[in-house]
Amino acid sequence: MTVEQVTGTAPHTTTTAGREPFLARTKRALAGAPDAPLVLLGNVEVEDAWAVGEVGLPAVGGASATAALVHRMDELALLLAGPHDHVVLKAEPDPDHLAHLDALGVGLPTVHVAGSSDPLRTVTLDALDSPALLARLGELAADGVRLLAHGTSSAEEDLATATGLRSVLPDAATTKTVNSKVYSRGLCDELGVEQARGWACRTVEDFERACAEAARLVADGATVGVKDAYGVSGKGILVVDDPRRLDQLVRMVARRAARSGDDRLAVVVEVWADKATDLNYHFTVGRDGSVAFDFVKEAITEGGVHKGHRIPSRLPADQVEALAELSGRLGARLASDGFHGLVGVDALVRTDGRLLPVLEINARSNMSTYTVPLQERFQPDGWVALARQYPLVLDAPLPFAALHDLLGDLLPGAPGEAGLVVQGTGTVNAGASGPTSGATFAGRLHGLLVAPDDDTLTRLDRAVTERLASRPTGRPTEGDAR
């Protein structure tokens, strides 16, 4: 796209992103210069921090079985950063993987590893517990390096305070506000943006009314999703196709409120739309309020859990233009509420071909964010790509050298060749961080498949899946490879 669009008077100008590299555009918008040095922090699922103090769905407590795996997604930031940037990680990246990327011509950042690491903590909390790392980050701050986190919570504010690093993102309170699903529905109502039929619930009374209406629709055959305001990746969501389940949920919520004396609630209730294709589109809100539409990708999801993207989307040009125009309106509204940064919006194409342009707004880095520099380097014009995650069942750590031997000719030898670009090995071996006593554990391999056409892409994906499955192993004893 080359059309420049203006959605209102300056500074709320929306442009479609041109050929300047994504990282340079991001730095220009958020740090004021395309070559501004940054410290990147992959604190994925920051929603868990935002959800603290919120009253959501009744749930069983305890740590997620996949928390250790999710926290090792910090390594995704490695390939978003440039050679003059810095990345903080929970553990040392695999040196053979770094050598492989270097041989492919990827300019890698300087890596700083936390001295204290707990599998169940985010990379931010590990960094805060690492005095030597804090001192080094303080030196970078004195040199003018700034902080770009996946998203800002109070922990990232604490890190900025402890090191002197200035964040290129807004404060935690603002970021939390604009990432609520309740906020998202209200924003769309205000702008007149079509969304799934639903209700934003701030009190138990709101929830009772919403569920009464939803139960009638479910009785007529509809399916309803009940979502926590800060649920993510399939957590904090109930899919309901029986009105009795809604009645049960209302009773549970009402009893809890009666016991606590607190009738606050932060959930949304939505009627599931008939879906042909999931979408994720992405825009950047600059510090000056300008909005740049970055891209739209087809999203691959299973049960509400992100699994990958197909790139580029196969939307017709008029629908891409419609999403670009809407990005300007959404971005301007976010800017008026004090937000600047990266934004991904989940949407879908209905079975009749019409767009449902907003399911939820994620005003933070998205999974779609992290593959853009790889696309720019490894996906030639006219080629197709698949950002993919492969579940693994392992009985011992799988180093990159072994992965390289296993996948062999399925890995590209240079940009412009078809193959799988491996994003990291942190999630592959995250389950091995605790004692296994010979038991198996779940891992996950993230990568970007590139090919000249869809048929080749499909064959390549199948070949990678088969090679990975050819490793002899049992089934995981706990957790899953979500």
Task: Pin down the residues of each PLM region.
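Histidine-anchored nucleotide/phosphate-binding helix
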Residues: 66-82
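Conserved N-proximal alpha/beta basic substrate-recognition cap immediately N-terminal to
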Residues: 72-76, 88-209
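Conserved ATP-binding module of the ATP-grasp superfamily
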Residues: 194-196, 219-225, 242-274
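Conserved anion/nucleotide-ligand pocket segment
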Residues: 221-238
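A long amphipathic alpha-helix within ATP-dependent nucleotide-binding catalytic cores
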Residues: 263, 271, 305-354, 392-417
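ATP-dependent carboxylate/phosphate-activation module, predominantly the ATP-grasp catalytic core
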Residues: 271-276, 281-333, 338, 362-389
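Peripheral (often C-terminal) accessory segments that flank ATP-dependent C-N-forming ligase machineries
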Residues: 379-482
